Regions:
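TRNA-recognition modules of translation machinery and tRNA-sensing kinases, especially anticodon-binding
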Residues: 92-391
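N-terminal alpha-helical targeting/anchoring segments
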Residues: 1-97, 115
Length: 391
């Protein structure tokens, strides 16, 4: 970088010198004087300027390449730590589900019901795919509609139906490219399948200058998400925890810089509301510096209790990215003083539909293998009380 600054300084000096000589040439020619020496000097300067310009362009590209893979700066209140072991539990909600029998895992429950088929999905698509049938397919749809209704009708989010295919620039803007290309699926035409609808929702503001009085923007969407899980070999190979394709309700906020901290807390509460209404036990964790995502300055994870694993598992991640994404995608706002500055962006799961479904299967299971329906979902499931074995 220091070399680049020196090059730019030298380049500017030569350009100024060339401009002054060019003025002198014009003056001499207008008065009939000989300007051959100045013309020769300008020609020599042009060669030097072109050489310096090439060098500075090359260094600028190198600097950009380096900057593209440098993550966001953690916020001051993000705890320090190397990995997830240093994450801090800040809230626990609800009592851990207790059973008078040994609870089954969601994949066994789904198989026994005849409504969850990993084998046929693997035959047609490969590992880490699932087919949901009958009442479990209905449960997935019920959860999706329930979440969208809560976020749009109660929390004030605007529902968006975005593309599932995006260009390089969209993924660069949100921070998935260039560093995490191995975790993405790319088409032969060069498009990418979205790993999360955070990508298209946040990019609604890309290359825009927004009137600050129109902010905040709050968007929600239900989409399929696609991830290659390249770095997850051997992890969660059974069940629905880690799939190549899964559905998720996403929350995205685009706000004024001074409002992002408060918006982050609000977004967390919106995601928590889903689990509270589903009456699922969960906890909230603040991620340490070593476990933060690439674009995040501060992240809360919500983890739902899974009886079969006897532990909490992530079901939502809510992140404040400050101006990191907006600077990459040129999302800006115009203030009342006509100043232009970057907006702040936030994103969160509201929540992962598949993980909510498996959490319901495990926490609402009965000894006979049937599944009780959470009260808030009954209107979305034809008012049935249970998903029964061999129904």
């Amino acid at each position: 970088y220091d070399k680049y600054v020196v090059l730019l300084s030298n380049l500017q000096k030569l350009q100024n010198e060339r401009n002054n000589l060019s003025k002198n040439i014009g003056i001499k020619k207008s008065s009939g004087e000989d300007a051959s020496e100045e013309i020769k000097a300008v020609s020599e300067l042009k060669t030097s300027i072109n050489s310096l310009q090439d060098d500075s362009n090359s260094l600028e590209e190198n600097i950009k390449t380096i900057l593209e893979v440098i993550p966001n700066m953690p916020s001051d209140d993000t705890p320090e730590g190397k990995d997830e072991a240093s994450n801090k539990v800040i809230k626990v909600h609800g009592d851990i589900t207790s059973f008078s029998f040994s609870p089954l895992s969601h994949d066994k429950l789904g198989f026994n019901l005849g409504m969850m088929d990993f084998d046929k999905a693997s035959e047609m698509s490969g590992a880490r795919f699932v087919i949901l049938k009958d009442k479990l397919a209905l449960l997935e749809r019920a959860l999706s509609n329930f979440m969208l209704n809560i976020h749009t009708q109660k929390h004030g989010y605007t529902e968006i139906s975005p593309p599932s295919l995006v260009r390089d620039s969209a993924l660069f803007g949100t921070g998935q490219l260039p560093k995490f290309s191995d975790d993405l699926f790319q088409t032969t035409s060069g498009h990418w399948l979205i790993p999360t609808s955070e990508v298209p929702l946040t990019n609604i503001a890309s290359n825009e200058i927004i009137n600050k009085d129109l902010l905040p923007f709050r968007f929600t969407s239900l989409t399929s998400c696609f991830r290659s899980e390249a770095g997850s070999a051997g992890q969660d190979t059974k069940g629905m925890i880690r799939l190549h394709e899964f559905k998720k309700v996403e929350l995205v906020s685009i706000v004024k810089p001074n409002d992002s901290s408060g918006e982050h807390e609000r977004m967390l509460q919106c995601a928590e509301e889903i689990l509270k209404q589903l009456e699922l036990p969960y906890r909230v964790v603040i991620l340490c510096t070593g476990d933060l995502g690439f674009s995040a300055a501060k992240t809360y994870d919500i983890e739902v209790w899974l009886p079969s694993q006897n532990k909490y598992r992530e079901i939502s991640s809510c992140s404040n990215c400050n101006a990191f994404q907006s600077k990459r995608m040129k999302a800006r706002m115009r203030s009342s003083e006509n100043n232009i500055e970057s907006v702040h962006t936030l994103n969160g799961s509201g929540v992962a539909v598949g993980r909510a479904l498996l959490a319901i299967l495990e926490n609402y299971q009965n000894k006979d293998g049937s599944i009780d329906i959470p009260t808030v979902l009954k209107p979305y499931m034809n008012n049935m009380d249970k998903i029964k074995l061999n129904e």
